[in-house]
Each structure stands twice: as structure tokens, then as C-alpha cells.
Amino acid sequence: MSATQTAQLMDGTGHARRIVEEAAAKAAEISQRTGTAPCLATVLVGDDPASVTYVRMKRARCAKAGIRSRHIALPATTTTAELIDSLSGLSGDPEVHGILLQHPCGPHIDERAAFEAIAPAKDVDGVTMHSFAAMSFGLPGFVSCTPGGIMRLLEAYDVDLAGKHAVVVGRSAILGKPVGMLLLAKDATVTYCHSRTADLSAMVREADVVVAAVGRPRLIRGEDIKPGAVVIDAGYNPGNVGDVDFDAVLTRARLITPVPGGVGPMTIAVLLEQTVDAAANQLGVQQ
């Protein structure tokens, strides 16, 4: 790319809308055929303002897509054992088809133990070890929603990953690690980077595809990006700022996701899609 060219924006909002419209049509069909609408249970521990906002947003999106939502608000003093009891109850409730535990839950909660209380058939957020293993082996199951949304966006823009060098900056269990596995499944050569990586900039400069998912505002600079690279900014920091220095990268990348309007809407769209799929599976509706 020349210095005067700018990257094409990857429109997560528009592509997410199409996914949600398809999910809504499937939800309506399920309701018509079974008399039961798909149901997503959201579980929130405490009253962190950002988490409250995220849950409210997800429930609103459910309503627009014809998905029922059941909200369980637990006090900040909830113990891991109490949270596990709540999640186990929802896992055994036939009226609930998907379960979302909003995280982080607080430093006193063993989140991994809590996630594992979610039945795999209802793990529509793709957070359990079962879901990660199924995804890694290419078996049926639910993917982590943000990685799933990223892959759908890459597909929508016809990004050929075979033989490409993809650098994932971040190694969280629900974003960095799974998106790397999904990229690998598309025949990309994947490098993971993290807080202990020596000379991060040099690593990123070798990438054909960059996924920034570390939660550090503007960590990825313009000079870090190979001209013509595809840049996925999965970070979201205060002030609507991602992990990528957007303005600086805009004149070097070929494709880039904006923040907001890129990865975020795709994450919610995949959550709704997987909730509908979970309901279809549990209610015996072939799609």
C-alpha cells in the first residue's frame, strides 16, 4: 500500500446484523414448531457497571432476535460454591438452552471451576474445557464467541489464511488461545505473543494477519505493521480505544477492524447464533 492509501474498514456491525437476522429467523421457526422460544440465561456476580451494561446489551439483542432471556443477579459476596450451584441448576433446567456467565466475576471466584459447571450442550459462550477441546480437534461444539466472530469477519472479507503468518497478541483462555487454534485450522502459521515476548514489535512486523487481544490501549503501533497486513483489533479499553493505534495503522494495513463497530458486534452475533443452535439441538429441531 502507498502512504496515501487507507485500509478498508471491516464492518462488524453490518455483518453481525446479517448473522442476527438469520438467527432470528431460526428462532422463530423453533418457536413455531415446538411452542418454545430459545432461552439464554445470563449470570452476573456483583454490580460492576461495565458488566451490568454488557449483560443489559446482550439481553436487549436477545429480545430483538426472538430469544428469551433469564437473568440471575448474584451479590458480590457470592462464593465459588454458590455460583457453581446456580450454574449447575441452570444446566439441568430444560427451559434454559444456553448459559452465559459474565466475567470477570471478581478475584475471590474460581472462574475456571465456575465455567466447568456449565453443561457443554449449553456452553454457548464457548468457555468450557470441553468446548475448547472440541474446537481444537475440529469436532462439533460451540466456539468462544469473540474468536468465532473474528473468523466469520475474516471469511466475510475473503481473507485467505492458508500459508499466511498470523500473530496473536494475547493468550487468554477465551480469546487469544482459541483464536490461534481457529487460525491454525485454516492453515495459517500461528505465533502467540504476550507480556513476556521479547521484541514484540519485531514479531508483529512479520505478520500477514495481526490479532490484538491483550487489553492494552494502542499497544500495536503503525510502524509495527507490515504494509498490506490484515489487522484485527479485539481490544476494548476505556474511551472506546482498542489495542491498536488505529489512525497510525490505517495507512499501512489492507484491512482493519474499527473500535467500536468491528469485533464487538460479531461477538454478540455469534452468541445469539449459538444460543439458537443450542435450542435446536436440545429441542430436536433439524436445521
Curated annotation (Swiss-Prot):
One of its GO terms (cellular component) is cytosol. InterPro entries: Aminoacid_DH-like_N_sf, NAD(P)-bd_dom_sf, THF_DH/CycHdrlase, THF_DH/CycHdrlase_cat_dom, THF_DH/CycHdrlase_CS, THF_DH/CycHdrlase_NAD-bd_dom. Pathway: One-carbon metabolism; tetrahydrofolate interconversion. GO terms for biological process: L-histidine biosynthetic process; methionine biosynthetic process; purine nucleotide biosynthetic process; tetrahydrofolate interconversion. Its EC number is 1.5.1.5, 3.5.4.9. Coiled coil: none annotated. Keywords: Amino-acid biosynthesis, Histidine biosynthesis, Hydrolase, Methionine biosynthesis, Multifunctional enzyme, NADP, One-carbon metabolism, Oxidoreductase, Purine biosynthesis. NADP(+) binds at G170, R171, S172, S195. The keyword Amino-acid biosynthesis applies. CDD domains: NAD_bind_m-THF_DH_Cyclohyd. It catalyses: (6R)-5,10-methylene-5,6,7,8-tetrahydrofolate + NADP(+) = (6R)-5,10-methenyltetrahydrofolate + NADPH; (6R)-5,10-methenyltetrahydrofolate + H2O = (6R)-10-formyltetrahydrofolate + H(+). Catalyzes the oxidation of 5,10-methylenetetrahydrofolate to 5,10-methenyltetrahydrofolate and then the hydrolysis of 5,10-methenyltetrahydrofolate to 10-formyltetrahydrofolate. Belongs to the tetrahydrofolate dehydrogenase/cyclohydrolase family. Homodimer. This is Bifunctional protein FolD 1. The gene is folD1.
